[in-house]
UniProtKB/Swiss-Prot annotation:
This is Methionyl-tRNA formyltransferase. Belongs to the Fmt family. Pfam families: Formyl_trans_C, Formyl_trans_N. It is an enzyme of class 2 (transferase). Its EC number is 2.1.2.9. It comes from Bacillus cereus (strain G9842). (6S)-5,6,7,8-tetrahydrofolate binds at residues 110-113. PANTHER family: METHIONYL-TRNA FORMYLTRANSFERASE (PTHR11138), METHIONYL-TRNA FORMYLTRANSFERASE, MITOCHONDRIAL (PTHR11138:SF5). CDD domains: FMT_core_Met-tRNA-FMT_N (cd08646), Met_tRNA_FMT_C (cd08704). The gene is fmt. One of its GO terms (cellular component) is cytosol. SUPFAM superfamilies: FMT C-terminal domain-like, Formyltransferase.
Amino acid sequence: MIKVVFMGTPDFSVPVLRRLIEDGYEVVGVVTQPDRPVGRKKVLTPTPVKVEAEKHGIPVLQPLKIREKDEYEKVLALEPDLIVTAAFGQIVPNEILEAPKYGCINVHASLLPELRGGAPIHYAIMEGKEKTGITIMYMVEKLDAGDILTQVEVEIEERETTGSLFDKLSEAGAHLLSKTVPLLIQGKLEPIKQNEEEVTFAYNIKREQEKIDWTKTGEEVYNHIRGLNPWPVAYTTLAGQVVKVWWGEKVPVTEPAEAGTIVAIEEDGFVVATSNETGVKITELQPSGKKRMSCSQFLRGTKPEIGTKLGENA
């Protein structure tokens, strides 16, 4: 039986681990990030992958730094024939990459060489792409730069969010892995080098990227809101207060107005001007210190005026 070590951390990784178990491989160990404090009470919380591994009685390693010798030697001691990673969250050292008979392969949520990095799902939507996908490739020390083994395309729908696309790609990754591993073991795959001229990056989202830039086009603002839903969530400011914007709709704006200005207030939301003739009607938001709510609920208690400028004093 093929001995596999799985390395992964978030919810995205769980269906991949589950599929390895269902397909009958001997998962001899799981490597995941350490437990982290979560929420206002800072409750020490295990990763989703750790929770899944423990359900199946699989030994779990949680190195703070996998590149340290005493940590990677624990992985090598498991003597895996194959290592599979999916959103592990640390750069894996060569000592591990070179050890397994069938190598180390990674399940990545983009059509490489596009969108290398830790936030490919967010960026696929934020950049307005109509499709993305899953790539399974050999791992190298350089970020997401290994030779491609298999790929599958996944359509991005008009109202797709990072949350819904995350779920689709997670399942697509598990399914593609199920088809890829037997072909890899049988030596039936021809690795394809990535075209370095086509490389783009999707680095982890920083706080300053979450703010809505109303000077962009309506389409770009709409994609920005979708791409940061349900985490970390786009935000703007209204009357000097931070407001998270959970959802908006593209609407035509016929009269010229300064970008970021409220140009219409309707029953279900208010329309904000952008840099072109497509405005964004905010329909779901979350004022600072309050719960997420529909804009119609918000407007019952707060009455912004037409001409109010959003995005100032953030």
